[in-house]
Amino acid sequence: MTPDTAWAWPWWSAMVAVNIINVIVCLTIFRRTTRSAGGFSNITDQYQKHMLIMGLIFTMVGAYRAVFVSRYLYQFAWFDVLANSSLLIRFFAIFAELSFAGLFAYAMLRFSKDLASNNHTNPALNFIESRSPYLLFFCIFTAQFFATIATINKNNTLFAIEETLWTVGFLLI
């Protein structure tokens, strides 16, 4: 530990501790859900299966990224090891971010189905209920290409496009 980074170790330790708790909670929920169904393959509700998988991916990648912190644009890494490679972490982030978007989109579609309204005369409201979750996922999916290329090329503009796509996706919902 150098004097330049001494301030960051408490922050890093807190982030790792929070993510350890997240992983424990995630695995507990996953285990209880699969055990009560008699195994993962016995879960008949596809919504529950997909949400479990996406939640597990998002939580595990989040924990990995909390341990191996990096800054893509400047290729800064917390540790000088291959596991802290910006490109490797970006690759994992693709799955985590798509899982995150999928969790939101899938939950919104389920709520829209379960809480169906009888008022379909308003086209804007009908669009928000039925199509915006797909557009959210599409925006986040498209953003992944810009983020990955920006990580390789170290291009600020591509990172800005990625963030803009995230913003557009969430403004749509």
Predicted regions and their residues:
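First transmembrane helix
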Residues: 5-40, 173
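Short aromatic-rich membrane-water interface segments that cap or initiate transmembrane helices
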Residues: 5-7, 80-95
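Membrane-embedded alpha-helical segments of multi-pass membrane proteins
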Residues: 17-21, 88, 92-99, 165-169
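Internal transmembrane alpha-helix with an interfacial aromatic "cap," most often the third helix
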Residues: 24-34, 64-73, 90-133, 141-149
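Perimembrane loop-to-helix junctions flanking transmembrane segments
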Residues: 38-41, 75-85
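Membrane-interfacial loop-to-transmembrane alpha-helix junctions, especially the N-terminal start
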Residues: 40-57, 121-137
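A generic, lipid-embedded transmembrane alpha helix
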Residues: 48-74
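Elongated scaffolding segments in large macromolecular assemblies
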Residues: 136-173
